[in-house]
Regions:
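Sec-dependent N-terminal signal peptides
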Residues: 2-13
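Beta-strand signatures of extracellular beta-sandwich domains
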Residues: 60-62
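A short beta-turn/strand-edge loop motif at beta-sheet boundaries
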Residues: 50-55
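Short solvent-exposed capping/turn motifs at the termini of beta-strands
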Residues: 46-49, 175
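Short aromatic-acidic-glycine turn motif
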Residues: 65-74
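N-terminal edge beta-strand
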Residues: 18-34, 152-154
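Membrane-proximal low-complexity regions enriched in glycine and acidic/polar residues
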Residues: 75-175
């Protein structure tokens, strides 16, 4: 089952009463033995009590699969044999994670908001600790991101949320 998080960011500092109404063409995606990919269409509108602010709105959409703990191993050659030499337990890594934005990610969300809402792919992965003898524990989380990104399971889709008339938006996300 996928969970959906939608962050709505306005590029103005004025406080307004706004809400977001969203819909998806699929509420659930069944992963079965015959699953060969799917596409999720997300659409919505910004409901306002006042006229739209000046300036462009920014929208960030995240779609995440269930998080699960995983063990990440580092292989090294020991006496001519490749073997697992280090292991780090990653507490929670989503099985699928996609971030779609209405413009460039760095101009859509700042570091404080990213830290607070855990929007970016590295922040969506929770790795609390590692054995004391592993000095580069962050590289294990990086390996999870690298491997799952190569498989299409982690996606950063910049400029993929279309906004019409500062009110309607839509995006489409491919699941491998």
């Amino acid at each position: 089952m996928l969970r959906l998080i939608l962050l709505f960011l306005i590029s103005t500092s004025s406080a307004m009463a706004e809400s977001v109404v969203i819909g998806m063409d699929k509420e659930k995606v069944a992963i079965t033995a015959t699953f060969d990919g799917s596409q999720i269409l997300l659409f919505g509108a910004v409901k306002r009590d006042k006229p739209a602010p000046s300036g462009d709105i920014q929208i960030v959409v995240t779609i995440a699969g269930p998080s699960e703990p995983i063990s990440v191993h580092r292989k090294a050659k020991v006496l001519g044999i490749w073997m697992n030499t280090d292991t780090v337990e990653v507490d929670a890594a989503p099985s699928f994670y996609a971030v779609a934005t209405s413009s460039n990610f760095s101009s859509t969300i700042n570091d404080t908001e990213d830290l607070r809402y855990k929007v970016s792919i590295p922040r969506a992965i929770r790795s609390v600790g590692a054995p004391m003898d592993v000095l580069d524990a962050a590289s294990f989380s990086d390996a999870v991101i690298r491997i799952r990104s190569a498989k299409g399971l982690y996606q950063l889709l910049e400029n993929k949320v279309n906004i019409d008339e500062q009110t309607l938006f839509r995006t489409s996300i491919e699941m491998p």
